[in-house]
UniProtKB/Swiss-Prot annotation:
Residues 334-353 have a biased composition (Low complexity). It comes from Tetraodon nigroviridis. This is Rhodopsin. The gene is rho. PANTHER family: OPSIN (PTHR24240). Disulfide bonds join C110-C187. Keywords: Cell projection, Chromophore, Disulfide bond, G-protein coupled receptor, Glycoprotein, Lipoprotein, Membrane, Palmitate, Phosphoprotein, Photoreceptor protein, Receptor, Retinal protein, Sensory transduction, Transducer, Transmembrane, Transmembrane helix, Vision. Pfam families: 7tm_1, Rhodopsin_N. The record marks E113 as: Plays an important role in the conformation switch to the active conformation. The chain crosses the membrane at residues 37-61, 74-96, 111-133, 153-173, 203-224, 253-274, 287-308. Phosphorylated on some or all of the serine and threonine residues present in the C-terminal region. A lipid is attached at C322, C323 (S-palmitoyl cysteine).
Amino acid sequence: MNGTEGPFFYVPMLNTTGIVRSPYDYPQYYLVNPAAYAALGAYMFLLILLGFPINFLTLYVTIEHKKLRTPLNYILLNLAVANLFMVFGGFTTTMYTSMHGYFVLGRLGCNLEGFFATLGGEIGLWSLVVLAIERWMVVCKPISNFRFGENHAIMGLAFTWIMACACAVPPLVGWSRYIPEGMQCSCGVDYYTRAEGFNNESFVVYMFICHFLIPMAVVFFCYGRLLCAVKEAAAAQQESETTQRAEREVTRMVVIMVVAFLICWLPYAGVAWWIFTHQGSEFGPVFMTIPAFFAKSSSIYNPLIYICMNKQFRHCMITTLCCGKNPFEEEEGASTTSKTEASSVSSSSVSPA
């Protein structure tokens, strides 16, 4: 083993010189330069500074504008709530602990931070899955005479929370555990050890299959079918430049959504799986910290992609920020009207919202 395992922690450094200490009690500056902890704290502050306004504004604008409170937008509000969980339950904690250079909040704080960060991340993950399924159902109509309504939206929300809890709760009750990871300033699921009595092996396999491979397969399938439907509609109206433009726009948005999903989850899942399958191999603290950056930054770019790219949400946000008047209203309105009239598969139907 190329690390030091202790009660409820694993430090990725052999204690050959006796300098390794518990990440709950002592600064971990022997792992990386103290400047790296300052950089981590600054990064967390940036995520809070950007993530809170974007996601809070999403909720506020929806409350203010009744036309946004439609079943198809429920999942976007769920995504904003998930991101706020990450901001308050994860980012603020990591910023505070990185300022001290170790997980100063102790074992209980590690459980709470790990739980809320995992819960928020998983709600966000399954919200993207439900979002893809909803768009596929609305556009491709795999079920004839199906009309998406409020009950379906509520079922989708309940599903995201059930799946998120199915991932975040088990480490609190003995199936795996939360321990400090990376630079030892944030907590996550124990991929690092085979600690007796925690069944880490089965939990990691369960997470990798049920909370990464299956969601990724569903997202790829739904957006793949959606793209096929849009291209078929565009092929049937080849003479319409507006339809072709709408098809290109939808393709661009789908590619962005899929790439963002992969950027968010593939590095973290890949590194976690490598650590799990190569236990005892040597790796540095930054090896797990950097992929976590990609997953955490989703609280910023997911709202930008799934909410701010939606014309209706964007219009209402600008109206709210500009005290009730949208200076771009005429331009956006003309564009939307033209596209809606000319295309049988409007890009707004398959846009992020």
